[in-house]
Amino acid sequence: MSEKLAARLEKLRRRHPQALADIYRGIEKEGLRVDSKGFIAQSDHPQALGSALTHPNITTDYSEALLELITPVTREVDELLTSLQEIHQFVHANLPAGESLWAGSMPSLLDGDESIRIAEYGESNLGKIKHVYRRGLAYRYGRIMQSIAGVHFNFSLGDDFWRAYQEVLAQSAPLQEFKSESYFSLIRNFRRWSWLLMYLFGASPALDRSFLNGRDHKLDQFGTDTLGLPHATSLRMSDLGYQNNAQSSLKICFNHLSTYVKTLYDATHTPFPRYEAIGLQRDGEYIQLNANLLQIENEYYNTIRPKRVTQSGEKPIQALKRRGIEYIEVRCLDLDPFSPIGVSESQIRFLDAFLLTCLLSDSAKIVDEECSIIEENFLTAVSRGRATDVELVRLLQNDYVQGGLQEWASRILEQVELCARELDAIKGGDSYAVAVRDARAKVNDPSLTPSARTYAAVSNGQSYVDWTLAMSQAHHQTLIANPLSPERMQHYVRAGEQSWADERALREADNLSFDAYLKQYLTYV
């Protein structure tokens, strides 16, 4: 595998030496607003942060308290991190007194479902759609699951790269068709190897008892209210976190764009008996958009998604079907509790090299048997990935072979290092090599992983809530102590004001009743 990857990199270097410079990235970082005691905030989305419906950089995810901070798309890692830092600085400067952003992926203190306010988006029809969709999630899965936070990493390559890579592979298909097929190749390898990201960057080995809300569990207890597993990397991505039994019946295919689109289309058009029993309205108000297996495509949970920016009135799968894949969205990353902005430069650079490795390596179609093995490997890594005896299953020369996690991780890192070297050669310096070196150190010494560091803190006297609250408040003080320049502060003030004007314009432009708008919204061309 490494030989073919190395050969492709060598051809790109020789024929198109700048092709790998054509990387584009964006980050969507979630964070729960909490009060001074560590309880989920009950306050409204702060007015100064603009309209959650229309602001380009600051919105809410599921709950009124769950902020989502969105960077512009950038070509440079430094620029990406600067944007994320600035958005955090502006947000922290405008939080209600006593509030901070929760540093952990697993939520703060909760008091049942009712303590989690569903996000509000105003009185426009689009705003109501977003709110009703979230009400539907509450009835289907409960609100507590929706209080989990993470980082989404968006990744794409420009047409200069794609033309170069198509030439290297001697492919003659239309460029967009080639891009979509190649992105699916990336996705398949990502699914095979994403357990490595959980090992390296998972940071949720423990949680507060209030998250379980009386559910059965097999977690160990530390002190009064902290629960966890000694070798877990990411309870957020385990069956305690994002779980969806109804969706387990979905066999989402990542082998071809057409079958992926069809499967999602069918799921958004197939009634599901349990959701039909919920009904669409109560007391004259909508409580879900429809009773289908998925209300809309976004309800489908996975560790990675193919994406295409939608046009006005267009649904995600319509955009994919019409114009193909534009970028991929990595969705399995925990917040880094040790970083004020939830991610680090080393992590971003590793992701660049890792995703290129997924793309440039051979990627056979995934059959049902391998799909089950992929899911089992992932669950093993999130629940006991740091155990010394943990083993995973991989496909080797048409046979499934069991082996140690660390051995397989080392083999993957050898390939990632090849891509890291090429990126360093193009960009200058050794920042990509350092990122891989950091990853290798974690593979050799599990105590260096963020999950181990978090577990050590919360299993030695401090509760999960106390430790995470202290980290959250420390990050808040760090960001407050380093305010934006007046010019950048004014930029975000104006963006907030413009978002309110945009939201008002949307509301005033509505010329349909909500019933008619919803019917139109759910109609696919």
UniProtKB/Swiss-Prot annotation:
Reaction(s) catalysed by this chain's protein: L-cysteine + L-glutamate + ATP = gamma-L-glutamyl-L-cysteine + ADP + phosphate + H(+)
Alphabetized UniProt keyword annotations: ATP-binding, Glutathione biosynthesis, Ligase, Nucleotide-binding
Any single biological process term in GO: glutathione biosynthetic process
Pfam families found in the cross-reference section: Glu_cys_ligase (PF04262)
InterPro entries the UniProt entry points to: Gln_synth/guanido_kin_cat_dom (IPR014746), Glu_cys_ligase (IPR007370), Glut_cys_ligase (IPR006334)
A single cellular component GO annotation: cytosol
Family: Belongs to the glutamate--cysteine ligase type 1 family. Type 1 subfamily.
Designated name of the protein: Glutamate--cysteine ligase
